[in-house]
Amino acid sequence: MKTIKSKFATVAFALAGTFIASASHAQDTTPSVVIVHGAFADGSDWAKVVPLLQAKGVAVTVVQNPLTSLADDVAATRRALSNQQGKVVLVGHSWGGTVITEAGSDQKVSALVYVAAFAPEAGQTSGEQGKGAPTPPGISQIKADGNGFLSMTPEGMAKDFAQDLPAAQTAVMTATQGPIKASAFEDKTTVSAWKTKPSWYLLATDDRMIHPDVQRSAAKRIGATLAEVHSSHVPQQSQPAEVAAVILKAVASVGAK
């Protein structure tokens, strides 16, 4: 009898080990997500999306951009990428789209997700992206300080940057925003990662910072899988579930390969 019990125990432990190993393997093979925030923001801009991704077992890192130049932000993103295990889905919002276009050439990056973002060609600047399209109203609410940095005014944050969020929240966003060096918008990319990596694009239909027509054109030009959301420039704040869903589709697509 003891021998039989011992055999059953051995089998049970073996099965348990198999299940644990399988679960561990699933976690190891699930791509991680690295998020690059845009101008006039910081990493907290993604506080509503991060837990939705984590709830699905996805490891998430949000880059804290210095916003001092394209090179500096790309360097910060590459540091984050160097700490990832396995495949990475790289996400960029607004100015962050320019950053991931450059940093996305990293071999760990398997897919790109653009959220109401710039998606320049190699050799282009962010400032060139809106040429030929109507000037978004929020541009008039970007103000320069005496040190060469740009910020959103409180009025612009409330009425143009995040017009679908409550005043109490936009007040916090104004206080925590990251000013960007004005010259960064004239920094040229050297590569276009989207030419070699599958891309997704989430278009914000009520965007008053990057014209929706510019976003639609960018998505078509880079051959991205396009989704649209009824949102201001910050769908990660007003429609976090929609944003998370697009990112998770990219994760699932990359993880299946």
Residue map of PLM features:
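N-terminal signal peptide c-region/cleavage motif recognized by signal peptidases
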Residues: 21-23
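Active-site catalytic motif of lipid deacylating hydrolases and related acyltransferases
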Residues: 27-85
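Active-site glycine-rich loops that stabilize anionic/oxyanionic intermediates
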Residues: 38-41, 94-95, 118
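Gly/Ala-rich beta-loop-alpha elbow adjacent to hydrolase catalytic centers
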Residues: 91-96, 100
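Flexible "cap/lid" loop of the alpha/beta hydrolase fold
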Residues: 108-109, 113-154, 158, 181-184, ...
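Active-site nucleophile elbow and catalytic-triad environment of alpha/beta-hydrolase enzymes
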Residues: 172-194, 205
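Short beta-strand/loop motif that positions the catalytic acidic residue
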Residues: 201-203
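Conserved loop-alpha-helix segment in the C-terminal half of the alpha/beta-hydrolase fold
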Residues: 205-231, 237, 242, 250
